[in-house]
Amino acid sequence: ACAEYLKRLKPMVSLEMVEIAEESLGGGESPALIRRALEREGEKILKRIGGRAAVVPLALEGRQLDSLAFAGELDPGKNLSREQLVFIIGSSHGLSPQVYQRADWRLSFGPMTFPHQLARVMLLEQIYRAEMILARRSYHK
C-alpha cells in the first residue's frame, strides 16, 4: 500500500521515506534503557532534518485533524514552509524529548496505537488526500 501512495504522490510532491532502525534495549526494558535508546534514536533523526524543515511528529497528544484541516496545514500558501516538510513516526517507545522540542506541531491519528507499517500507510494516504484537496481534484469524498 505504501508503494501505491508513493507512486500516486510522485507527480505532485517530492517525497522521500527514510527509516531509522530502532535502537536495541540490550535485553531489558527499564525506563533508563528506554530513555537512552530514545535519545540515540532522536540524535539520528535530528541529524537527518534540515535546519529550515517543518517538523511534524506523530504523537498521541498531537492535534487530531479531519482531512480538510490537514490539507490546510499542508497548503504552502497558508502555513508550513514546504521547503522540507518532515513527518516522524516514532519507535515502539515513542520519540525523544529533543525530537518533540524540534517539532513545529504534532499530529495524532487518535488515542489508539497503530503498528508502524499501518501508521505509515495512513499518513501517506492522508498526504495524498490532502494534495488532491489542495489541487481541487476529486478523491476526497
Language-model regions, residue ranges each:
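Glycine-rich, flexible N-terminal cofactor/catalytic loop recognition
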Residues: 1-14, 21
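Hydrophobic/aromatic beta-strand patches that form the interior of the parallel beta-sheet core
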Residues: 18, 56, 105-107
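Structured adenosyl-cofactor binding patch, chiefly the S-adenosyl-L-methionine
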Residues: 97-141
